[in-house]
Amino acid sequence: IFNKLVKKSNYNKRYSQIKKFNSKNKYQKKGIAITPVKFGISFTTIHLNQAGALVHIYTDGSVHLNHGGIEMGQGTHTKIAQLVANSFGLKYEKIQISSTNTSKVPNTSASAASSTTDLNGAAALNAVSKIKTNIENFIKSKYKIYNNKEAIYKNEFIIFGNKSFKFKKIIQEAYLNRVSLSSSGFYSTPKIKFDKKKFLGRPFYYFCYGAAVSEVSIDTLTGETIIDRVDIIHDAGNPVNSALELGQI
């Protein structure tokens, strides 16, 4: 990332140009810096690395979702609803999400440490997984499907090999056959432990990486500062919603 950014931002050439600019200008000055970051994803207070969620499917094929993350404009609700929609093979509009409430999902952790979507999204998917198991067992039993192929949820259909079933229709049939279409979900971050007194252990489950080059100008008489240009590279993995990630940057 660092070397790629040096090249992409033309850092070395700009650094030389800025040195020349500063030597010729008494009051207007420029600066340029490149900064890498390696950011750990998890709470170092280990017990906070847990989350719950609640998912219901209704007979019209819509889904209700509640989780323990706080939406404060960063897009958490949107991203977790997208995760649920993608897992069920539904359109985003089919997911109805209600505001966080401890009467629905108790003992919520803080929405911080860049872990909110990780924790609550995983809890929501855990609930989805339980419901999908119920649905798939019902389909296999009713329609006598004996192969071990994994079910595919896509475009509002549930697909087993060469057989496909409309999601809404199967949900209605499952309800009439007394199949549970609701579940709570839970997630706790694995493989982490940390002794704050000794500063030993594995406090983070994984790291994210990035780097930035910033060029600024300052008027040394007035103190006015202007950000002239910023180049950023993030190793963003597979973003749930690229537009929201760009918005946060």
Where are each of the predicted segments found?
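Cofactor-binding beta-sheet edge motifs in enzyme active sites
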Residues: 1, 7, 13-249
